[in-house]
UniProtKB/Swiss-Prot annotation:
Keywords: ATP-binding, Kinase, Nucleotide-binding, Phosphoprotein, Serine/threonine-protein kinase, Transferase. The gene is pknD. It comes from the Bacteria. Together with the serine/threonine kinase Pkn1, may play a role in the specific interactions with host proteins during intracellular growth. Belongs to the protein kinase superfamily. Ser/Thr protein kinase family. This is Serine/threonine-protein kinase PknD. It catalyses: L-seryl-[protein] + ATP = O-phospho-L-seryl-[protein] + ADP + H(+); L-threonyl-[protein] + ATP = O-phospho-L-threonyl-[protein] + ADP + H(+). It is an enzyme of class 2 (transferase). GO terms for molecular function: ATP binding; protein serine kinase activity; protein serine/threonine kinase activity. Autophosphorylated on serine and threonine residues. ATP binds at I10, G11, K12, G13, G14, M15, G16, E17, V18, K33. The keyword Repressor does not apply. Residues 4-291 form the Protein kinase domain. The active site is at D138 (proton acceptor).
Amino acid sequence: MQRYDIIRMIGKGGMGEVYLAYDPVCSRKVALKRIREDLSDNELLKKRFLREAKIAADLVHPGVVPVFTICSDSDPVYYTMPYIEGYTLKSLLKSVWQCDSLPKDLAEQTSVGTFLSIFHKICSTVEYVHSRGILHRDLKPDNILLGLFSEVVILDWGAALSKEMQEEVLLDIDIPVTGSMFSNMTIPGKIVGTPDYMAPERLRGTPASESTDIYALGVILYQMLTLSFPYRNKKGKKISFRHQISSPEEIAPHREIPPFLSQVAMKALAADPKVRYASVKELKDDIEQHLQGSPEWTPKTILHTQKAECWKLRESILLSKYFPMLGVSPALWYSLAISKIESFSEVRLEYTLLRKGLEDGFGILLPPSEGVDHGDFYHGYGFWLHIKNSVFSVSLVKNGLEIRKTSRPIKENKEKFFIALEKQNHRLSLIIDHVVWMIHMDYLPGRGGRIGVIIQDVTDVCGNIVVLESSGSLQVSCLAVPDAFLNEKLYDRAITFYRRIAESFPGRKEGYEAQFRIGIALLEKASESGDSEGFTQALGKFEILHNSVAAPLEYLGKALVYQRLGEYNEEVKSLLLALKRYCQCPEISRIRDHIVYRLHETLYSNHRLSLVFMLLALHIAPESINATEEEYFVKNLHGKIQDTLFCNLDLSPIDFRSSKMELLLSYWSGFTPFLPGLFQKYWDLKDYRALADVFYVAADLGNREFLEMYSDLVRENICSTTCTEDIVEFLPHQLEHFFSGVRAISLHEPLEKVFAHIEILDPVLILYLFDLFAKDALIHHRGELILSAITLIEKYVSSQQYYEHLLPCEVLAYLWMKDEKKVYNLLCNNYEESLWLDDRSPAFVLYGCWLALVEDSSLSYLHLSGCREDALYPRALIGGFCSPLGICENQLSYQERRKLLLQKFIFFHCLGMNEERDNCTVAYDLLSIERSL
């Protein structure tokens, strides 16, 4: 100990003494703990003293004081630790015990909220210690140090024990033994710990466990909540094994202890270890839930399924009339019941269903308060639950539209299912057997007011439906009144109250949320009245949020306005700006959640924007797409994958979560902001084949800015690029010649310039150039040049590539030249007649155009209209156009609209409808320039 200058003693325990010392080598104060001199000759006690130091040294956590040095060869043995200024939790509790009134600062220090944050840190430390296989065995306020700078550390590891170790012979209990020289320390043969903090089973001699540490934490929590012990006894007296502990709420009503925290404390203090928390993590999570303001559910009412007085409306309905997308038989009748009570702003419903009821199908709805008597019960949100072939499916419905679905296999012998639905703030969750199956976020004030149930046989509900209410948070309560006005469409009154809240909470979350909802109210009002000025006013209110901590809400609000106006380019632009500018802002999660919602909304309504939102979701929130949804999305994209040149030329399967999928979605949607990121990724990997794919997509979409910027970058770096074995498909300098060909196509230069370096180009690049050239030549009335191009490049590609990619264009060229015999011969010699009738084959449209050229137009329309309507490939879109039902071009993606215009162009040309044909050229060029989503 000669190295240290002892300043003063700061503590004394059973085996050791703690001194404040100065370390001149490190120029710092330390806490030095040494074994008591009168015990230094006891080898067993010395071993225990060093074990305490080694256990603490092995733990690395902010809640454990680290050990600097351990000196086991000195006399006496000692170890050093950082010196933390502060006081024990016991001294703080002692300062307020049995005090009628407290000074303001002490009242704040010992408030329930302050103590909870301390207790959460204690739990975090014990959770870590347990994860390392260590039991403390003597958790109590004496052993918890509160630093002056918010440190919370656990002291005294003398009783600590590895869970793998058995109880030692030398055990201790914190009870003095009169007349013994060891009166303040471990007594051989006794139980380790302090009786007031020991679990009942521990007092009976049961070995220590995580559960006994949890019990000690329960006593500490009880003291923090009530400022008193859960039971009273004098040390040394016999402790009852069966004791009744009063609820903290009853003991200290003046402390305003939330019922939830009382339940937490009582669960930790349960006499039966099986009833206690299974781990410290579970206890900590409950405390964390309260600290974060998460809902704490308490039962409020019960809906008796078979009692008429609980229901405002009960009638039979044909479910298929209101929810046609659920695939329910049109002849099946279901019972609909709408509750008399209105649900709370935050509500949880709990019920148990028989398997039979789920096999028939069960719906739980949150319809609006108004209009339920007039058939509007399907408005708002709800869940449809169904079991078929031991697969449990859950569909989220909104306004009668299925916007999301998930399915999972279940056990064949399972007959009952516990279901819970939670509505909390912007979150709607469905829980099955205590597992979250689906979460949906909606940041607009909810319209749901009542509770609706759809079922075939009410006896399939086991018991009743329990309605639980959450205590909620300040934000929800202060916004509840204007939200209610908004739900009742009293827009002006809602705006008045929102404005008051915004003015009352400047710079705070509540104020920003109120400002956001002012814009929402104006948007709803404008949508209902059709007032264009109202949309402008809503945009203005959202702009007030600019550069605030809630800045992402400005762009979310604007996106909602543009969505309502049908200005989808501006909608997506707003969302992208938010993601780019505020990626670190907490509110950005609302943008991500909205994008995922829009993906489901557009996909299930077959909207062309679904590809854009799928691309956005893959880029920013891939984890939000589960395996079932992924399978559904890939199935929907199958036709597009088949009709994509860079997918056909690369036979490797396309993974949904790959960069290639992002490129595919960019190509079909015409949405190019992610192309620079894909370029950078492939450039870093030196994947020149993938780079060629990116440049082909940019060229096809007419993104000249990207082509010029990044082709120059490639040219500048080609000379310094070292060709290695990794470059397996083609050399980087081939890209330079590809760029020259693309530029020649855009300038309508002669064919020889487009394919000037064909002899050194890889066939993939040749086919990319040909595809770009052929489409440009055909739509601009130069279809005959396609034949010249084929003659030039035919010898550089394989026979299979000729058949798949050149032959269809050769037929198109002869259709343009109206050479009916040549077209017919090419069809007969290269395609079986069965393929002429297969809309998945290129021959289907080519044959239809040949019929338009040589036969009556009605025959060509009849042929083309024979295409399948359920899964129409992009290569056969003209078939949908010719069908009696027609095709909704507004639902087609950017690339589908271009393909349809090309097909209509050659079809009208063959029919001799030159004006309609020329209109297609104008529309094609305009679409390429505007590239509207």
